[in-house]
């Protein structure tokens, strides 16, 4: 299931992950924070990277400018 809906809104899991990524985290840290299975986090993070909302550097995931804007819109 895509994490970004056709209307541009985010699925609830994607919303939760980008809220966690206000500071950089590894996939494992995201799992611990949200109590989700690693496979679900990895697949959602992969889609967020493809959507240019999240970037990965040395195993750490963080928000891009567009991702940070999504967090502001949700707040």
Identify the residue ranges that each predicted region occupies.
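A short, conserved structural fragment
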Residues: 49-59
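Minor-groove-contacting beta-hairpin "wing" of winged helix-turn-helix DNA-binding domains
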Residues: 59-66
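Short, charged/polar, Gly/Pro-enriched secondary-structure boundary elements
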Residues: 68-73
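Residues within the alpha-helical elements of helix-turn-helix
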Residues: 33
